[in-house]
Amino acid sequence: MKTIILILLILGLGIDAKSLEESKADEEKFLRFIGSVIHGIGHLVHHIGVALGDDQQDNGKFYGYYAEDNGKHWYDTGDQ
């Protein structure tokens, strides 16, 4: 009787360990997916900024006029 209970207990723990491994794999897939979504959103925001001229730090074309120092400033619409 003790042997049967011990065998059933070992088999039961093996099944639980397998389901735990499967849930860890699913969690890793989900976190990897969320990471790739966040990474993609970052790229999208960067490319929208490039298209709108946010990356043009040294040529004074960021929504403003040229200054006396060759436009070496970041401009926004309030500094005109």
Swiss-Prot record:
Keyword terms: Amidation, Antibiotic, Antimicrobial, Cytolysis, Hemolysis, Secreted, Signal
Prodomain positions: 18-29, 53-80
Domain of life: Eukaryota
A single Gene Ontology CC term: extracellular region
Pfam families attached to this UniProt entry: Clavanin (PF05452)
Tissue specificity comment: Pharyngeal tissues and hemocytes.
Record PTM Leucine amide, positions in chain: L52
Keyword Secreted listed: yes
Chief location: secreted
GO BP terms, alphabetized: defense response to bacterium; killing of cells of another organism
Compartments where found: Secreted
Cleavable signal peptide: 1-17
Task performed by this protein: Exhibits broad-spectrum antimicrobial activity against both Gram-positive and Gram-negative bacteria. Has potent hemolytic activity.
Protein name: Clavaspirin
Organism of origin: Styela clava (Sea squirt)
Taxonomic classification: Eukaryota, Metazoa, Chordata, Tunicata, Ascidiacea
